[in-house]
Swiss-Prot record:
The active site is at E203, E417. It comes from the Eukaryota. This is Beta-glucosidase 12. One of its GO terms (cellular component) is extracellular region. One of its GO terms (molecular function) is beta-L-arabinosidase activity. It comes from Oryza sativa subsp. japonica. A beta-D-glucoside binds at Q53, H157, N202, E203, Y346, E417, W466, E473, W474, F482. It is found in: Secreted. Belongs to the glycosyl hydrolase 1 family. Residues 1-24 form the signal peptide. Keywords: Disulfide bond, Glycoprotein, Glycosidase, Hydrolase, Secreted, Signal. It catalyses: Hydrolysis of terminal, non-reducing beta-D-glucosyl residues with release of beta-D-glucose.
Amino acid sequence: MAAAGAMPGGLLLTFLLLAVVASGAYNGAGEPPVSRRSFPKGFIFGTASSSYQYEGGAAEGGRGPSIWDTFTHQHPEKIADRSNGDVASDSYHLYKEDVRLMKDMGMDAYRFSISWTRILPNGSLRGGVNKEGIKYYNNLINELLSKGVQPFITLFHWDSPQALEDKYNGFLSPNIINDFKDYAEICFKEFGDRVKNWITFNEPWTFCSNGYATGLFAPGRCSPWEKGNCSVGDSGREPYTACHHQLLAHAETVRLYKAKYQALQKGKIGITLVSHWFVPFSRSKSNDDAAKRAIDFMFGWFMDPLIRGDYPLSMRGLVGNRLPQFTKEQSKLVKGAFDFIGLNYYTANYADNLPPSNGLNNSYTTDSRANLTGVRNGIPIGPQAASPWLYVYPQGFRDLLLYVKENYGNPTVYITENGVDEFNNKTLPLQEALKDDARIEYYHKHLLSLLSAIRDGANVKGYFAWSLLDNFEWSNGYTVRFGINFVDYNDGRKRYPKNSAHWFKKFLLK
């Protein structure tokens, strides 16, 4: 899940997303109907998840600690309800129930991530391969395939090995490139005969900005003046260094897969990026430029190297020597290193031009010289969800997809996350908690926006809703719920379909 804690600016309003209609489910009144049949033949629908947010079993089956285990246990004050992912949604034990839910809804695919430390407890081959971890993922993959659900596997969704953090500061060191490649190769060898779609990294933007600029996410590094109250870090350099190494690790892994595995296994490999859409705060060239810089610093940071072999000119100009350089060989390696792009979209912001800073407190959060806010003249850009950063703005989905088409050569895209949350209101009876009509409206409008982009030529091949289940939402803990299926955290993590799950079942009828 993309958690946008690093976004500078923004006014926190406590709007309810939309009033739940007590008389029954949202029926799409006033909106065109939409269903699976509206989309091109072969278009894939699925749900998405991640290992730390879902699995639990943190100390079971030979799994080693990740940076999120350390972060949540050492800094519970950085999580809204002081919680952690020790049990999470307990998919480590309940994965068969999860697959049954997908099958019942008619989903075609399931995007999940592998826990690096469940495969390599110490992060590297030298620490040994954990056969129990291999067995767990084999069981999950085989269960999915037996129910007709395609696995889409993400290799890294933010839970890097604590052992490598201790050894060489994790993604701040180029040493991680080979360790990641070794881990990826084990996954290709063990699972690639059945897995036809691989994603190397999930949202490097979120990992680097929240982990190294604001310090709100693991590993919790930032400059002393940033909001994360970190004991160590450099918000003006480390985000760029960590993501530079992620791009290089991605490219090396793609090269490995294409050289040794793709011809035999006949799979595809890509990377998942996140982007908001950015609307100029007012009609002016300076604000138009601010909106362009905002998308460069969130999306172009990764997309430009993947398409053109270097960072955006706006980043080169504003970040200067704090932004790492690619060698000629690295530039060639990164350029074109994907079969598809995964794209996560949730929300939009207004972008307002900021004057240059004094250059003393350099930080990724201010380098773009764009003030980002969900509110203009007291009016939000769209209804606000439970997460303070998430404003509902469906037209931004279409705008972003057409921006990708027009600026980056219309690559093959899978929407790897899209969704909305509600507050975890513990006083609601179960039957009331299952009434998530605002989520149905969110999906209906975003799927219409997606369909419009496809009809205008956007090369989108699939869509994954975030999320199958309620889960551990990073710094929000369990205070918000993104699931289309309810998880009862007080009764054995039992799952109950929300209204949105029933809506998807009707939507997906063939």
